[in-house]
């Protein structure tokens, strides 16, 4: 999503010894960024949509193998996010091992109900600390629950 350039991951800021090279075309990267943003604006990653920070991401839910058989309610969920989607600077990868079904999730244990909202909360807290400039474009504001909610037509949380 960064234009198609691989950068060796590091925990060090301004690490000069990074291995960088092109792995996919710029246009393919741009298209993937658009698709991954759609996961958060219109798909199973909606609960990670942090107004102003253009989160993009991919959800994942995998049934666990127990005694040679996949078990429906034993899953690992994941969410790989990047932000801001227009110019990705940060990535966040979350995994939950066997999340429990809750009343609030109507018993669902897929990524969109547990890993995704947790990632959204983390991003909403760390983005300002990382000095990521919020971008409240008009289209995002129109789609947001803030503008949709009115006294005549309240929006459920």
Task: Show the residue positions of the predicted features.
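Short, Gly/Ser/Thr-enriched beta-strand-loop segments that form substrate-interacting elements
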Residues: 51-84
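Extracellular/periplasmic catalytic domains that process cell-envelope and extracellular macromolecules
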Residues: 71-74, 82-88, 145-146, 154-155
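Conserved active-site-proximal loop/helix segments of enzymes involved in bacterial cell-wall
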Residues: 1-50, 101-112, 129-153
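Residue-level preference for non-acidic, small/hydrophobic
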Residues: 32, 58-60, 80, 92, ...
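Short, well-ordered beta-strand elements
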Residues: 80, 88-107
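C-terminal, active-site-flanking charged/polar segments
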Residues: 86, 112-129
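Solvent-exposed loop/turn segments at secondary-structure junctions
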Residues: 39, 61-63, 85-86, 96-101
């Amino acid at each position: 999503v960064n234009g198609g350039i691989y950068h060796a991951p590091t925990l060090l800021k301004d690490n000069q010894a990074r291995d960088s090279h092109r792995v996919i075309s710029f246009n393919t990267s741009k298209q993937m960024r658009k698709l991954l943003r759609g996961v958060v604006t219109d798909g199973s990653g909606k609960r990670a949509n942090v107004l102003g920070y253009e989160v993009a991401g991919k959800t994942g839910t995998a049934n666990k193998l127990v005694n040679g058989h996949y078990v429906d309610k034993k899953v690992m969920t994941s969410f790989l996010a990047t932000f801001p989607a227009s110019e990705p600077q940060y990535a966040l990868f979350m995994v939950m091992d066997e999340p429990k079904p809750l009343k609030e999730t109507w018993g669902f244990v897929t990524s969109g109900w547990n890993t995704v909202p947790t990632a959204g909360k983390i991003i909403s807290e760390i983005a300002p600390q990382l000095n990521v400039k919020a971008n409240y474009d008009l289209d995002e504001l129109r789609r947001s629950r803030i503008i949709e909610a009115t006294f005549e037509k309240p929006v459920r949380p």
